[in-house]
Amino acid sequence: MANKPFFRRRKVCPFSGDNAPVIDYKDTRLLQRYISERGKIVPSRITAVSAKKQRELAAAIKRARFLALLPYAVK
């Protein structure tokens, strides 16, 4: 009896679509979801964010850190 190979569903970018949230450096609640508990930016292969939106997200997180809206490192 041959088993079917495990089919992993392709994740969809959370920032694409009609009612998708806009990436904004002032929206710290949204940005916090894409930062690890150590304060690092989570890679797109884990969050399923597209490459273009991952660059926007990284820039927004870095801008928020510079303006002291987000911490650089978490204790």
UniProtKB/Swiss-Prot annotation:
NCBIfam families registered for this protein in UniProt: S18 (TIGR00165)
Pfam families: Ribosomal_S18 (PF01084)
GO molecular function: small ribosomal subunit rRNA binding; structural constituent of ribosome
Annotated GO CC locations: cytosolic small ribosomal subunit
GO biological process: one example: translation
Keyword Aminoacyl-tRNA synthetase: no
InterPro entries in the cross-refs: Ribosomal_bS18 (IPR001648), Ribosomal_bS18_CS (IPR018275), Ribosomal_bS18_sf (IPR036870)
Keywords, alphabetical: Ribonucleoprotein, Ribosomal protein, RNA-binding, rRNA-binding
Top-rank taxon: Bacteria
Species: Cereibacter sphaeroides (strain KD131 / KCTC 12085) (Rhodobacter sphaeroides)
Assembly information from the UniProt record: Part of the 30S ribosomal subunit. Forms a tight heterodimer with protein bS6.
Function, in words: Binds as a heterodimer with protein bS6 to the central domain of the 16S rRNA, where it helps stabilize the platform of the 30S subunit.
Family that this chain belongs to: Belongs to the bacterial ribosomal protein bS18 family.
Name this protein carries in UniProt: Small ribosomal subunit protein bS18
